[in-house]
């Protein structure tokens, strides 16, 4: 019995040590500016848009409609966007974006309305 407890504790410590050493590097600053395409899936339907972003403004085209958003970076990998010309109450809500992982030309992100616990995910690819 004593051996099993010691073995379990040692295994748990080893597992904790190994997982804490793995920290995937995110190069979020590479994606603060540029031209991008975004893909997200909501309830089985795929949505694609293109956008151009500088440090504080994002201009997005979705299904031929152009929207402009203010961008406020809260840290290197998180930012909040808010529509500058909302047409309804839903478009007035700011959206919190968090970059989860990065590759050389793309990143995976998570987003939600500020204060909402329901999160969605998507992928952004930087265009050349």
Give residue ranges: language-model regions.
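An anionic, turn-rich surface loop/hairpin at beta-sheet edges
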Residues: 80-104
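A short, structured loop/turn motif at beta-sheet edges
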Residues: 70-78, 99-106, 126-128
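Bacterial N-terminal signal peptides that target proteins for export
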Residues: 1-10
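Short, exposed beta-strand-loop hairpins at the edges of beta-sheets
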Residues: 60, 100, 108-121
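N-terminal glycine/threonine-rich, aromatic-flanked beta-hairpin/loop signature
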Residues: 46-74
């Amino acid at each position: 019995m004593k051996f099993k407890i010691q073995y379990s504790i040692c295994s748990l410590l080893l597992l904790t040590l190994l997982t804490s050493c793995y920290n995937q590097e995110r190069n979020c600053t590479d994606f603060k500016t540029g031209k991008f395409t975004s893909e997200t899936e909501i309830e089985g339907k795929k949505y694609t848009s293109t956008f151009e972003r500088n440090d504080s403004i994002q201009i997005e085209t979705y299904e031929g409609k152009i929207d402009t958003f203010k961008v406020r970076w809260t840290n290197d990998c998180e930012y909040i966007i808010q529509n500058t010309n909302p047409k309804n109450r839903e478009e007035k809500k700011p959206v919190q974006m968090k970059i989860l992982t990065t590759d050389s030309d793309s990143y995976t992100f998570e987003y939600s309305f500020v204060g909402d616990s329901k999160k969605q995910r998507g992928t952004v690819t930087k265009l050349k």
